[in-house]
Amino acid sequence: MKCLWLLVITVLCLRCDTAGTKPRRGRGSMWWGIAKAGEPNNLSPVSPGVLFMDPAVHATLRRKQRRLARENPGVLAAVAKAQYAFAECQHQFKYRRWNCSTRNFLRGKNLFGKIVDRGCRETAFIYAITSAGVTHSLARACREASIESCTCDYSHRPRAAQNPVGGRANVRVWKWGGCSDNIGFGFRFSREFVDTGERGKTLREKMNLHNNEAGRRHVQTEMKQECKCHGMSGSCTVKTCWMRLPSFRSVGDSLKDRFDGASRVMLSKADVETPAQRNEAAPHRVPRKDRYRFQLRPHNPDHKSPGVKDLVYLESSPGFCEKNPRLGIPGTHGRACNDTSIGVDGCDLMCCGRGYKTNTMFVVERCNCTFHWCCEVKCKLCRTEKVVHTCL
């Protein structure tokens, strides 16, 4: 009997060791499924004031995210608009070997395939652009009164002129007014919603938190002041000014530049120390605010430490030349390329040295369009010849 118990304990220990060394899979964020599928609203159209959530969408959210949706009616529609982040990702990488392809699954963590299991540059961009998308859409939704729990940003106060008109002091030539996009709400809610599940205990979780924060920072710091003049005969005696979000295309351009200059990182020595080395009790859970208090250092000691708006990654990217079903990589076979370019969209790089084929095709397009009063645009149909190069 004693031998039997020893055998059982040995087997259990072996299983525990195996489970401990097995890498975590499916690191992608489940909420991505909302943005992909599109949730029109979380208010019931039948009973006003009653919250409604599609069961399929309900399954993509964690408990905290469902609570945030209940407490802030209208946010799911704003989160769904983060689908622009997917379109922007595909726009930025349409001429690259990895073109940010997504899968038609509702379960969000599978949208980009299992490449998100890898701590590479592409994963860093995915996390940053989706976090930025939520921040951007929420800030705008507040201005449009689409969310019950937030409004325009009225934190700006009127300012007196620095150069008084006509020598009179305190003559206001411009003032804050209008309706500013509520970047404060968008930033805070994105932190609460997007970062749910990222406890900041492992290096990979710290990477995700850093890149999520970088995406939000790009939206926040690129806010622009817009003004409208008021006065007699076109004069600008008074200007009403407000803060406006940048276009999401400009956010995508900035993050793409950060992608090209992303930093490979590791934990700093202070973060590597165990609680026992610091004579502290090991916490059961990292406090919410403390999970952002970490320092990543460059993998190459000759490089500078990454800033708050830089993208960071942990490992080299996989190859994108050949199809890899396990990682969801489609490969570059059949991709269009530019035979005159020496850049990443050129046939030499895009086709990974396999060569390419050239086809001539005829397409029918609208041309010679003219405007006729009122109000019609008439076009002719032209048959044009196009030369298309595709990778072998």
Swiss-Prot record:
Q: Give disulfide pairs as residue numbers.
A: 89-100, 142-150, 152-179, 227-241, 229-236, 321-352, 337-347, 351-391, 367-382, 369-379, 374-375
- List, alphabetically, the Gene3D superfamilies matched: 3.30.2460.20
User: How is this chain modified after translation?
Assistant: Palmitoleoylated by porcupine. The lipid group functions as a sorting signal, targeting the ligand to polarized vesicles that transport WNT-1 to unique sites at the cell surface. Depalmitoleoylated by notum, leading to inhibit Wnt signaling pathway.
Alphabetized, the UniProt keywords read: Developmental protein, Disulfide bond, Extracellular matrix, Glycoprotein, Lipoprotein, Secreted, Signal, Wnt signaling pathway
Q: Which InterPro entries match?
A: Wnt, Wnt_C, Wnt_CS
Q: Which family does it belong to?
A: Belongs to the Wnt family.
What is the protein's given name? Protein Wnt-1
Q: Which organism is it from?
A: Bombyx mori (Silk moth)
Instruction: State the function annotated in the UniProt record.
Output: Ligand for members of the frizzled family of seven transmembrane receptors. Probable developmental protein.
Question: Which top-rank group of organisms is this from?
Answer: Eukaryota
Q: Where in the cell is it found?
A: Secreted, Extracellular space, Extracellular matrix; Secreted
One biological process term in Gene Ontology = neuron differentiation
